[in-house]
A protein has these predicted regions:
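Phosphate-binding site recognition
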Residues: 1-252
């Protein structure tokens, strides 16, 4: 009897579309979309503890904004997933934003390793996975060969995991943003989930390794320093002008 009265609860962390497809409870926070994307700031950071719904919020942003690559500017998918939510009541905002922007969404939650080399490879794998979603741009007649070459490189996991190619990793967001602007004529929205994880993990491992190798005078704790250099280059796009429509980051 009770099972017919209540919806199921989500059993594990899920993205917005997965949650909607599951028929589970969903607390309508779609009005946050307008709050965030009409804010005067072009870079916003949300800091909350784990399990506070940051990832769900970011995937909701992505689902609402992203252009349908098969039918650009068609909003039928958004109308499906956001049916019955408050944001659809704001027709003017939806007309301007819903399904109208290319979106780059990346989570850095898995960037970890006991050594910098291991963490670098995880970082490269994460970026390559995201870049591979945009390989359809290789068939575009709007991109030149240099732009297509950049996408091919950052989509190639074996190539990107080699540290001698770290400049491609550092510039991967610029490569994607430039290609998406060329394709759609709109600067993309950048969503970075758990932006602080790589540096937090690097700091932890440096502290641990200092204790572990305290008697080894040749040991140098440079994991965190190397990660700072990598992150600085990767996030460099946030300082560029006329590259992104808006950037949203989450972290603890």
């Amino acid at each position: 009897m009770l099972s017919s009265l209540f919806l199921p609860l989500p059993e594990s962390p899920a993205g917005f579309e997965e949650l909607k497809n599951s028929g589970s409870y969903f607390v309508d926070k779609t009005e946050y979309i307008k709050t965030v994307f009409t804010d005067s700031a072009t870079v916003l950071l949300f800091t909350r503890p784990r399990r506070f719904g940051k990832t769900l919020l970011m995937t909701m942003f992505e689902s609402f904004l992203k252009i349908n690559k098969d039918k650009p500017f068609d909003t039928s998918l958004q109308e499906k997933y956001f049916k019955g939510t408050r944001i659809l009541e704001d027709t003017e905002f939806c007309k301007e934003f819903m399904g109208q922007y290319p979106v780059i969404e990346i989570s850095l939650k898995d960037v970890d390793g006991k050594t910098y080399d291991d963490a670098y490879k995880m970082f490269a794998s994460t970026v390559s996975s995201v870049a591979s979603k945009f390989k359809y741009l290789l068939d575009s007649n709007r991109l030149d060969e240099k732009e297509k070459g950049g996408i091919s490189r950052i989509s190639d996991i074996a190539f990107l995991r080699e540290q001698e190619n770290s400049d491609y990793l550092k510039n991967s967001l610029r490569i994607l943003a430039s290609a998406l602007y060329r394709e759609y004529g709109k600067y993309p929205v950048l969503l970075i989930d758990e932006y602080d994880v790589p540096l937090a993990n690097a700091s932890y491992h440096d502290t641990t390794n200092k204790k572990l190798y305290s008697n080894d005078k040749s040991f140098v704790a440079d994991y965190h320093e190397n990660m700072v250099t990598l992150i600085k280059g990767f996030f460099g796009i946030l300082k560029d002008k006329n590259t992104l429509t808006r950037t949203v980051l989450t972290g603890c």
